[in-house]
């Protein structure tokens, strides 16, 4: 597994249980997990991972609102060049993405307690 694949899996993991925003949750959680692996992650890597997940049908983007309609599915990857001031754009896993997430990832770096597996390593390509 290379760095890009790892970031994609970590991002997918973050959007499997709820709609999540890049700047509110995804970036912070993935950066925290990546640090356990000895990596510093940039926000742009998260955005790239989300674009790839959407392109491959593993995730979708939504606009969420406290007013009807409460959620609006967006087509494709929205531009997220800057941090959102009002946190309107969220991401959620698709059925295909959930199937991937639930599959047995031998390359997932963490054990069931969230600790880095001693046999895990990142491929340098």
Regions found by a protein language model. Name each.
Residues 1-44, 48, 55, 87:
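Short amphipathic alpha-helical interface segments
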Residues 16, 58, 102:
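Residue-level marker of positions within ordered structural domains that often coincide
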Residues 19, 62, 90-92:
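Sequence-level detector for tyrosine residue identity
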Residues 36, 60, 95-96:
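Context-gated lysine
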Residues 47, 55-57, 81, 124-125:
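Generic signature of intrinsically disordered, low-complexity, basic-rich segments
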Residues 54-68:
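A short, conserved structural fragment
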Residues 67-125:
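Short, amphipathic alpha-helical interaction segments positioned at domain boundaries
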């Amino acid at each position: 597994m290379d760095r890009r694949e790892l970031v994609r899996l970590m991002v997918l993991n973050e959007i499997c249980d709820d709609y999540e925003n890049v700047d509110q949750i995804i970036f912070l959680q993935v950066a925290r997990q990546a640090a356990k692996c000895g990596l510093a992650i940039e926000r742009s890597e998260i955005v790239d991972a989300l674009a790839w997940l959407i392109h491959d049908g593993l995730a979708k983007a939504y606009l969420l609102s406290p007013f009807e309609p409460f959620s609006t599915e967006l087509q494709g990857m929205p531009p997220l060049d800057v941090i959102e001031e009002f946190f309107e754009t969220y991401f959620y896993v698709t059925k295909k993405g959930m199937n991937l997430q639930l599959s047995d990832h031998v390359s997932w770096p963490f054990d069931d307690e969230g600790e880095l597996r001693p046999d895990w390593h990142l491929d340098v390509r």
